[in-house]
């Protein structure tokens, strides 16, 4: 017990005497994911406004911010909770630019785009579905990299680190982003003159042929690391080439075959594969340098796939319903950060680009984690966003000029439209938990043993569901919890004046009636911050941000073996209503909800 207690106190010793700022809420869903989104008026209103805005932009009635005549795009909002049964699409919008004279003449959800580094999602998925041990060193599968004189300790580079951008190896394959035709420019800029033999023997545009896999591995032995493994995230295309070559050596199958068997066929994807795709279905930008039809070779795992809006929507939907891997827990593990950047708002996953933002729901501001992946190929930009908290996603592909900002503008516009709407819908549907619950005396219960329990819940402008009051035999139980905390854990800090409950995602059948489920919720023990600068005259105080510690106080208070923060709602899923609540630490049994 002492060890656990010190574990909680140590962060305070290192930072402040305080705990978290009021409102230090749990991560993840703050209310249950809303369902039947296709029937939601909030969603309908938001997407209708969004469609009108995009109509105005592509027609020139408002400033779009990109070359309308030369930029085609497809965008969708998806969810497993009410979206199309196959793709999950709730809403979609397509624009075929008038100058896109090649490729498809009918742009729809099955039209093909290059998706650039969104390919990394497919490759990481392939790795996660494989039978290899992700802790294995890359040299187990690519022994050519074993070389004592190599600046990189390849024996220390695991498959897992490669998939998480944490290996510290070079960003690109041999010759990538090296352009021999720029030699005159380099000299004019003062760079030293070089001979052709100074360049790598393969992979240099306009100088020599592309590297074979064997030549690539030979040259990599001489490459220098960018950092130590796990020192910091370093974005790497090369990493995906290497672990895909490792999988190919392990299975005896090439990347395209593995992708077909493990990802494309199981997900029933109809317009996804290794470039090149089908010209007649392609969205081909009318620009001089565009990548449609290119053969990406061993670079395909990091950025050489094509796909369609429907296929990417299916991918995101299967991630959101947790069915894309062997079990829901594996998918939830995938949707976790692996490292941090210097920005408080940017984390790195496998291979997710995670944006943490609190400005997308201005009426009810709170932190939202957007698990995104962007991708670019010459003339193409794609973006997928997975918002697990709400069970929704956004998919976007564009084809146009190399300097187009269309993807960035449209992506933000769509997120700004859908997230407030789905927040409103989540609050509306969570209204079924709101109300008054009162216990009833059972027929055979002695009158002297009966102690009425009353609970009142509300939804206000804060997060989760607020416990307005909880009493037993007219005793204020919420105040009682605060006093118990103060008596036993006051060193940690004092509980905030409000108590709110949040869903845990745990539910089970309540009875043999399959429509009734028990949903576990937990009270968030949020703490009032103490400010060092108010307690001491020592210099330098008040500069450290308060530490968010409510995640450390879950499941702490117990009453005779039962957690005091656990509340169980009894939900009739077929009827869409809450029929009662159980407060286990009060030994309440089921307390009926008053109509």
Curated annotation (Swiss-Prot):
* SUPFAM superfamilies the UniProt entry points to: beta-lactamase/transpeptidase-like
User: GO molecular function terms here?
Assistant: beta-lactamase activity
Q: What is its EC number?
A: 3.5.2.6
Task: Say which enzyme class the record assigns.
Answer: hydrolase
Question: Catalytic center at which residues?
Answer: 117, 235
Q: Which GO terms describe its cellular component?
A: extracellular region
Per UniProt, subcellular location reads as: Secreted
According to the record, which residues are glycosylated? 70, 102, 147, 156, 195, 249, 461, 473
The catalytic activity, as recorded, is: a beta-lactam + H2O = a substituted beta-amino acid
Which residues are the signal sequence here?
A: 1-18
Transmembrane segments in this chain: where? none
What are the entry keywords?
Glycoprotein, Hydrolase, Secreted, Signal
Q: Which family does it belong to?
A: Belongs to the beta-lactamase family.
Mind telling me what this protein is named? Beta-lactamase-like protein ARB_00930
């Amino acid at each position: 017990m002492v060890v656990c207690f010190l574990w909680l106190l140590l962060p305070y010793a290192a930072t402040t005497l305080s705990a978290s700022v009021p409102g230090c809420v749990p991560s993840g869903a703050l209310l249950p994911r809303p369902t039947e989104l296709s029937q939601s008026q909030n969603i309908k209103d938001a997407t209708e406004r969004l469609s009108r805005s995009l109509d105005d932009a592509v027609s020139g009635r408002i400033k779009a911010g990109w070359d309308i005549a030369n930029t085609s795009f497809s965008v969708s909002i998806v969810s497993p909770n009410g979206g199309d049964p196959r793709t999950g699409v709730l809403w979609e919008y397509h624009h075929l630019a008038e100058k896109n004279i090649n490729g498809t003449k009918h742009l729809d959800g099955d039209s093909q785009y290059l998706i650039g580094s969104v390919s990394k999602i497919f490759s990481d998925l392939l790795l996660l579905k494989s039978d290899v041990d992700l802790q294995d060193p890359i040299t187990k599968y690519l022994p050519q990299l074993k070389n004592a004189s190599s600046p990189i300790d390849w024996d220390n580079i695991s498959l897992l680190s490669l998939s998480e951008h944490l290996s510290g190896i070079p960003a690109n394959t041999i010759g990538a982003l090296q352009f021999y035709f720029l030699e005159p420019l380099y000299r004019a800029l003062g760079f030293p003159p070089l001979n052709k033999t100074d360049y790598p023997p393969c992979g240099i545009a306009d100088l020599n042929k592309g590297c074979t896999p064997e030549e690539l591995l030979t040259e990599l032995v001489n490459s220098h690391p960018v950092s130590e493994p796990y020192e910091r995230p370093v974005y790497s295309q090369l990493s995906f080439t290497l672990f895909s070559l490792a999988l190919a050596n392990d299975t005896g199958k090439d990347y395209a075959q593995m992708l077909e068997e493990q990802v494309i066929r199981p997900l029933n994807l109809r317009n996804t594969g290794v470039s090149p795709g089908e010209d007649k279905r392609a969205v081909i930008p009318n620009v001089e340098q565009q990548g449609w039809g290119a053969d990406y070779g061993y670079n395909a795992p990091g950025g050489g796939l094509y796909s369609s809006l429907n296929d990417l929507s299916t991918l995101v939907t299967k991630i959101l319903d947790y069915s894309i891997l062997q079990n829901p827990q594996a998918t939830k593990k995938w949707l976790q950060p692996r490292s941090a950047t210097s920005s408080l708002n940017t984390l790195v996953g496998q291979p997710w680009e995670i944006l943490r933002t609190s400005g997308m729901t201005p009426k009810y501001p709170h932190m939202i984690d957007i698990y995104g992946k962007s991708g670019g190929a010459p003339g193409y930009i794609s973006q997928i966003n997975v918002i697990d908290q709400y069970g929704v996603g956004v998919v976007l592909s564009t084809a146009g000029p190399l300097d187009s900002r269309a993807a960035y503008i449209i992506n933000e516009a769509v997120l700004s439209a859908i997230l407030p709407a789905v927040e409103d819908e989540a609050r509306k549907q969570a209204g079924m938990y709101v109300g008054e619950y009162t216990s009833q005396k059972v027929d055979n219960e002695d009158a002297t043993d009966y102690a009425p329990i009353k609970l009142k819940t509300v939804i206000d402008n804060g997060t989760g569901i607020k416990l307005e009051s909880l009493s037993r035999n007219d005793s204020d139980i919420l105040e009682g919890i605060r006093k118990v905390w103060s008596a036993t854990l006051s060193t940690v800090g004092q509980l905030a004046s409000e108590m709110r409950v949040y869903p845990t995602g745990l539910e089970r059948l309540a009875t043999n009636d399959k429509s009734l489920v028990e949903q576990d919720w937990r009270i968030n023990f949020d703490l009032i911050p103490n400010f060092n600068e108010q307690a001491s005259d020592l210099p330098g105080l008040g500069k450290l941000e308060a530490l968010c510690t409510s995640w450390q106080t879950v499941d702490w208070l117990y009453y005779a073996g039962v957690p005091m923060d656990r509340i169980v709602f009894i939900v009739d899923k077929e009827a869409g209503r809450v029929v009662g609540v159980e407060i286990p630490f009060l030994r309440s049994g089921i307390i009926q909800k008053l109509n």
